[in-house]
């Protein structure tokens, strides 16, 4: 049981942080979705993100993260305050955008056919890939070590529940002509899956490359050399009816991405 204690502690920290956040109250619009004018009138922008070393985190009693800093830069430019809620469940983050609990889904969101009908996506913010996470071989003929994606046949890969990587794994299964078993994990985020691989709790996981690269410094037993996807554009998401907010975000992003401040943030929080 002790080996699972660390994951429970991670979950409790995230839960405690979420509980002390003020609960967003839906207002004004009959469908619960605040348009940009309502956001401006309220003076508060509500965002949801994943708690991890890239998006949003606490270090030495200080809040930080790429999306944390981007959100504050946007809010400052628009004269708004920002409320950020950490939520480990991708499903709950997405549902919160759809029902108006949050205005912006501010983490690395991949635009795909399943999501394009449920939300709108900003212009791309950064590039990344999905990486197979496994342990480095402990001996010459380590049977669990994957040298080629073909060797994933009949293996079980753990992913965050509703992760876009599920579609890629399914396509990969078709490409190699054999079954790849997918185990969706609702309770933990990507960094927790990395720790579980490192501690022999599971053998394989899929993770965003930037998160994997950041975590690999603390988990030297991990192998993160095998990509399962091409490089993809990552964006933010907003409700499909919130076109004015989308336009405001896109206009600001296109200007901000040309600044030295943006380049410094990318260097600070990604290792690509």
Question: What name fits each language-model region?
Answer:
Residues 46-54, 62-76, 132-178, 183-189, ...:
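Bilobed "Venus flytrap"/periplasmic-binding protein-like clamshell domains
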Residues 121-122:
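Short Trp-Ser/Thr-centered turn/loop motifs at beta-strand boundaries
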């Amino acid at each position: 049981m002790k080996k699972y204690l660390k994951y429970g502690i991670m979950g409790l920290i995230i839960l405690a942080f979420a509980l002390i956040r003020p609960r967003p109250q839906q207002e004004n619009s009959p469908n619960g979705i605040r348009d940009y004018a309502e956001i401006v009138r309220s003076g508060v922008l509500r965002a949801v993100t994943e708690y991890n070393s890239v998006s949003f985190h606490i270090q030495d009693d200080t809040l930080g993260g790429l999306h944390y800093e981007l959100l504050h830069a946007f809010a400052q430019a628009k004269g708004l305050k920002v409320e950020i809620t950490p939520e480990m469940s991708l499903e709950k983050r997405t549902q919160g955008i759809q029902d108006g609990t949050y205005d912006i889904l501010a983490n690395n969101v991949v635009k795909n056919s399943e999501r394009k009908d449920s939300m709108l996506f900003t212009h791309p913010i950064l590039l990344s890939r999905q990486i197979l996470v496994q342990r480095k071989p402990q001996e010459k003929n380590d049977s669990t070590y994957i040298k080629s994606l073909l060797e994933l046949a009949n293996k079980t890969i753990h992913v965050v529940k509703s992760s876009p990587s599920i579609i890629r794994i399914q396509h990969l299964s078709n490409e190699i002509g054999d079954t790849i078993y997918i185990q969706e994990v609702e309770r933990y985020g990507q960094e927790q899956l990395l720790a579980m691989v490192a501690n022999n709790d599971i053998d394989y996981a899929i993770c965003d490359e930037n998160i994997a690269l950041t975590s690999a410094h603390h988990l030297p037993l991990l192998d993160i050399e095998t990509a399962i996807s091409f490089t993809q554009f990552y964006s933010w998401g907003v409700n499909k009816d919130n076109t004015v907010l989308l336009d405001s975000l896109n206009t600001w992003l296109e200007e901000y991405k040309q600044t030295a401040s943006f380049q410094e943030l990318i260097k600070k929080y990604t290792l690509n």
